[in-house]
Amino acid sequence: VLIIAVLFLTACQLTTAETYPRGQQRHHALRSTDKNSKLTRGCTPRNGACGYHSHCCSNFCHTWANVCL
């Protein structure tokens, strides 16, 4: 069963690689992920609380003070 699963996943990856030109799929996936993350959660405004996994609108978190910059 494991061998069949590995062969199936390999075939899927080869099919996907042939469908998209080199580099195009990677950038499309990043844009899609970025868009989905912005839709599902808002960003934390300046001086808002942040931590190890910050979601600051500016993408900068002062880790010592735990506030968005």
UniProtKB/Swiss-Prot annotation:
It comes from Conus lividus (Livid cone). It comes from the Eukaryota. One of its GO terms (cellular component) is extracellular region. The keyword Secreted applies. Expressed by the venom duct. GO terms for molecular function: ion channel inhibitor activity; toxin activity. Belongs to the conotoxin O1 superfamily. Keywords: Disulfide bond, Knottin, Secreted, Signal, Toxin. Residues 1-17 form the signal peptide. It is found in: Secreted. Coiled coil: none annotated. Its main location: secreted. The presence of a 'disulfide through disulfide knot' structurally defines this protein as a knottin. Disulfide bonds join C43-C57, C50-C61, C56-C68. This is Conotoxin LvVID. Residues 18-40 form a propeptide.
